[in-house]
Amino acid sequence: MTPRKENIPLTIDANYVVGFNYIRQWQIRGVVDVAPGISLGASAENPATIFLGSTATAPLGTGGAFASGGIVNGQVVNFVNTGGGGDFLQGVNVTTDQAPDIIEKAAFDPGWGHYEVFGLQRFFSDNVLRCAVGACVAGSTTMVGTADNKTTFGAGVGGSVLLPLIPKYLELTANGLYGRGVGRYGAGQLPDVTIGVDGSLSLVRGWSAMAGLIAHPWEGLDVYAYAGVEQVDSNFFNVGTTLFGLGNPGFSNATCLVTTPFSFAGNTPADCIANNKRLTDVTVGFWQNVYKGDYGRVAFGAQYEYIKRKAFVGIGGDPSTDDNVVFTSVRYYPF
C-alpha cells in the first residue's frame, strides 16, 4: 500500500504477467494505520473505459467493431470523444467518464506473510441520442431529437498475498480479482463493457488471477516463475437480423486462420470477428547481479514467456493464438 513499495512481478516484460492486477494512472490516496500490522487506504483514480463490442448481420455473421457514433435500436451512441489533433492530443480517443474510479484496501501484516483485500467501484458513462422522427442516421449532422447521459455502475473485489515459504530463500505471491466492469485492472486489458440494447454501456463480468514463486538461491540471484489467467463472459443481444455485443455466437470467425488480401493490408476481414474470451500466461526468468559496489549495481536478466489467446465460439469455431517470447536485459542502477 506504500507508494513505490508495490509487490510487482520481476519480469523484464514491463506489462508483467496476464492475471496481475495493476494500472498506471494518477490517483489521490489516503492511508491510515489503525492498529499494529493493519492499514486501511482509499483512493480516487483516473478513470478510463475499455470497450469491446461488435456488430454483424445474420445469417452469415459478417461485420466488425461497433464504433462510437454507431446505431442501436435507432439511437446514436457516443462513448468516445476524439481530440482535435493539435498540441499533445493528436487525435487521441478519450472515453466519456464522469467520475473517478474508487478503490478501498485493507492490508494485514500479522507476523508471517502480507495480506491485502480490496474493493473497486467504477462509473461508466455514454451519451444516447433518440431522434424525434424515425430512426437516427449514423454520421448525419442534421438529426433532431433528445439526448441523455447513461451511467452504469461497475464493481469488483480482490485480494493478494505474499508468503515467505522459506525465509530469505523462497516466496509465494498470488492475487485475484472478480467483478463486473473490471477488465482494465488486469494486465491483459480485457474489456470492461460492451454495448447494451438501450444504448447504455453494459457491464462485462470477468475475473483474473496470478500466482508465482520467487527464489533466491544465493545473494545476487533472483529466479522467478509466474502463471496467470484472465477471462470474461459473453454479453450480447440481437435486433432482428442485426447482431450486437461481445461473444455473440452468431458472429463469424470463418476466415480467422485463412490468409486473405486483408491479411497483407493489416486489416481484419468481416468474417473474423473473434472477440477475446480468455488469456493465459506462463513465464520463467532470472536476474543475476554482475556488479554491485560503490558505483551502483549492474544486473543481467533473461525471461521466457508463453501467452495464449482464446476467442469466443462463433461461426467457424473459436480461434486461438500461441505466442512464445524470449527477453534479455542488462540494467544499471546507480543508487
Task: Identify the role of each PLM range.
Residues 1-65, 96-114, 163, 171-173, ...:
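Outer membrane beta-barrel
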Residues 28-32, 104-108, 157-163, 209-215, ...:
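Residues on the lipid-exposed face of transmembrane beta-strands in outer-membrane beta-barrel proteins
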Residues 6, 53-55, 128, 186, ...:
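Short, solvent-exposed loop/turn and secondary-structure capping segments
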Residues 61-81, 85-88:
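Conformationally flexible catalytic loops at phosphate/diphosphate-handling active centers
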